[in-house]
């Protein structure tokens, strides 16, 4: 997948807007940027093209000395979130410049990366949509279990990747092919069609889909 421009933002929640034909469009509102460019990497020096951007400014006392020394080079403040955006071509921004929602336009297709909502420890029926065992006919205390988890002596182990009960959610999820419905630069807002990963106020990365 192509490495393209992107921006950091915060998921504010969902609402709806009306299309030109009067149709109702469910949208997610993302407050994105402005994100100062804290570092620029290029092919000659670093082996690849990328830019590091910051989001959610914090006071100096909340960063350690290595972070402070790194961010002082850009002289744009200190940030809770730093993200490196890798690019296929040269970086169109210089260190210290701002990346804003202006890089997107209504109708554009983007991909959104966020951390899914954590559900805690979940069984196989909730986590993997297993059917469970029979409700009657001798089933005892195992109605929601996963059943057999492997073979006998050969291979004598549970195979890697076997779907079992465990921690559900709280994983990095990328949803591609999302349509930008509206961009409002005066409020640093992007409205995208449908839902995106993560809880309300969760940090997301919005990138152009190459």
Curated annotation (Swiss-Prot):
Q: Which cysteines are joined by disulfide bonds?
A: none
InterPro entries listed in its UniProt record: Ribosomal_uL3, Ribosomal_uL3_bac/org-type, Transl_B-barrel_sf
What is one Gene Ontology biological process annotated in the Swiss-Prot or TrEMBL record? Answer: translation
GO terms assigned for molecular function: rRNA binding; structural constituent of ribosome
Superkingdom assignment: Bacteria
Q: In its keyword annotation, does this UniProt entry include Zinc-finger?
A: no
Stretch forming the signal peptide? none
**Which family is this sequence assigned to?**
Belongs to the universal ribosomal protein uL3 family.
Q: Which HAMAP family does this entry report, sorted A to Z?
A: Ribosomal_uL3_B
Q: What does this protein do?
A: One of the primary rRNA binding proteins, it binds directly near the 3'-end of the 23S rRNA, where it nucleates assembly of the 50S subunit.
Can you name this protein?
A: Large ribosomal subunit protein uL3
Q: Which organism is it from?
A: Solidesulfovibrio magneticus (strain ATCC 700980 / DSM 13731 / RS-1)
Which gene is this protein's source? rplC
């Amino acid at each position: 997948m192509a490495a393209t421009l992107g921006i950091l933002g915060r998921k504010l929640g969902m609402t709806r807007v009306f299309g030109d034909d009067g149709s109702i469009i469910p949208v997610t509102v993302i407050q994105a940027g402005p994100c100062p460019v804290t570092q620029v990497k290029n092919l000659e020096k670093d082996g690849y093209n990328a830019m590091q951007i910051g989001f959610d400014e914090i006071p100096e006392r909340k960063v350690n000395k290595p972070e402070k020394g790194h961010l002082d080079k850009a002289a744009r403040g200190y940030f809770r979130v730093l993200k490196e955006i890798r690019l296929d071509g040269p970086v169109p921004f210089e260190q210290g410049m701002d990346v804003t929602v202006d890089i997107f336009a209504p109708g554009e297709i983007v991909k959104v990366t966020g951390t899914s909502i954590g559900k805690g420890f979940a069984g196989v029926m909730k986590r993997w949509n297993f059917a469970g065992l029979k409700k009657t006919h001798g089933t005892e205390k195992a109605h929601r279990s996963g059943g057999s988890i492997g073979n006998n002596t050969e291979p004598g182990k549970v195979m890697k990747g076997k779907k079992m009960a465990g921690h559900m959610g709280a994983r990095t999820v990328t949803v591609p092919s999302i349509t930008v419905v509206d961009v409002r630069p005066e409020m640093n807002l992007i409205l995208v069609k449908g839902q995106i990963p993560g809880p309300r106020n969760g940090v997301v990365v919005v990138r152009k889909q190459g």
